[in-house]
Regions:
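A short coil-to-beta-strand element that immediately follows conserved catalytic motifs
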Residues: 63-73
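Conserved Nudix-box catalytic region and its N-terminal flanking loop in Nudix hydrolases
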Residues: 19-59
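Conserved N-terminal beta-strand and adjoining loop/helix that marks the start
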Residues: 1-21
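Residues that flank catalytic or metal-binding motifs in active/ligand-binding sites
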Residues: 7-9, 31, 83-85, 102
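Active-site-adjacent beta-strand/loop module that shapes the phosphate/pyrophosphate-binding cleft
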Residues: 6, 17, 73-96, 107-111
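Short, charged, solvent-exposed linker or helix-capping segments at domain edges/interfaces
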Residues: 96-102
Length: 112
């Protein structure tokens, strides 16, 4: 029985020009109707940053050119069964993501 913790990644995508963050609206699946950031589970034999780039590609329909990936936090649950790595990626311009089936909308927002 594998007792390794489940690990996930997530990233805030921040537009430095408009000072807004990209959020995605979940589709009619798990957590339907909730807003969140790009992210997901780290697959077996995948490194953290590989997983992050894969999730960006899957959820936004493309990659971010020459991303500057800034680690923010590594959260570990009290029981150690779950680890979540959080990052921020600054971009120069807002863009329109090509959403996959996991999401039905997006918005760029300030945190105020």
């Amino acid at each position: 029985m594998d007792t390794s913790p489940i690990e996930g990644v997530g990233t805030f995508i921040y537009c430095v020009t408009t000072k807004r963050y990209l959020f995605l609206l979940r589709n009619s699946s798990k957590y339907s109707g909730t807003w969140g950031v790009v992210g997901g589970k780290i697959e077996t034999n995948e490194f953290t940053l590989q997983s992050l780039m894969r999730e960006i590609e899957e959820e936004l329909g493309g990659s971010i050119e020459n991303p500057k990936i800034i680690p923010i936090e590594k959260f570990t649950s009290d029981n150690g069964n779950f680890i979540y790595h959080t990052f921020i990626i600054p971009v120069k311009r807002e863009f329109v993501p090509s959403l996959n089936l996991e999401h039905r909308g997006y918005c760029w927002v300030t945190l105020e």
